Swiss-Prot record:
GO cellular component, one term: chloroplast thylakoid membrane
Gene designation per UniProt: ycf4-A
PANTHER family named among the record's database cross-references: PHOTOSYSTEM I ASSEMBLY PROTEIN YCF4, PTHR33288
Main location: plastid
Segments crossing the lipid bilayer: 22-42, 57-77
Species annotation: Pelargonium hortorum
Organism lineage: Eukaryota, Viridiplantae, Streptophyta, Embryophyta, Tracheophyta
Name the record gives this protein: Photosystem I assembly protein Ycf4
Role summary: Seems to be required for the assembly of the photosystem I complex.
């Protein structure tokens, strides 16, 4: 989502609170909990899940392995839920022609560097660059070349932009910033 005026462009960046992340975290939690439950029921000799009689699953080695996978899955699931609750990767890109400043803000993981805030002068922007890689795993990323800083990605690598969409966004941004556009 973006908001534009004559001198200001504000681009809101979605973080990890996406439907797919919620679904994967839920599926992983339920599956790993079921694995842990089957492993525990094979150890105790009780039938906690009606689909798998505990007498058919021996604790060693099947129950141990299922318990291990259940615990590992719960750790990964908790990591995903924390990432979703912290909304890692969300933020905004703000381009202000009136003040001549570009601000890039992202939320990170908790700690000393939770808030990632970059500020540049517009006169230091050399170009807007599109990096396109075609093939089996095609990816198109939009970069902003900053003098003395290198390239800063403006789009996420997981976003699947069509060539037309990424080119249009790059052209609009380059026109707004009054810088050249490069394609690699």
């Amino acid at each position: 989502m973006s908001c534009r005026s004559e001198n200001l462009w504000l681009e809101l960046i979605a973080g990890s609170r996406k439907t797919s992340n919620f679904l994967w975290a839920l599926i992983l939690f339920l599956g790993s909990f079921a694995f842990l439950l089957v492993g525990t029921s094979s150890y105790l000799g009780r039938n906690w899940i009606s689909l798998f009689p505990s007498q058919q699953i021996l604790f060693f080695p099947q129950g141990v392995v299922m318990s291990f996978y259940g615990i590992a899955g719960l750790f990964i699931s908790s990591y995903l839920w924390c990432t979703i609750s912290w909304n890692v990767g969300s933020g905004y890109d703000r381009f202000d022609r009136k003040e001549g400043i570009v601000c890039i803000f992202r939320w990170g993981f908790p700690g000393r560097n939770r808030r990632i805030f970059l500020r540049f002068l517009m006169k230091d922007i050399q170009s807007i660059r599109i990096e396109a890689r075609e093939g089996f795993y095609a990816r198109r990323i939009l970069y902003m070349e900053i003098r003395g800083q290198g390239a800063i990605p403006l789009t996420r690598t997981a976003e699947n932009w069509t060539p037309r969409e990424i080119e249009q966004k790059a052209a609009e941004l380059a026109y707004f910033l009054r810088v050249p556009m490069e394609v690699f």
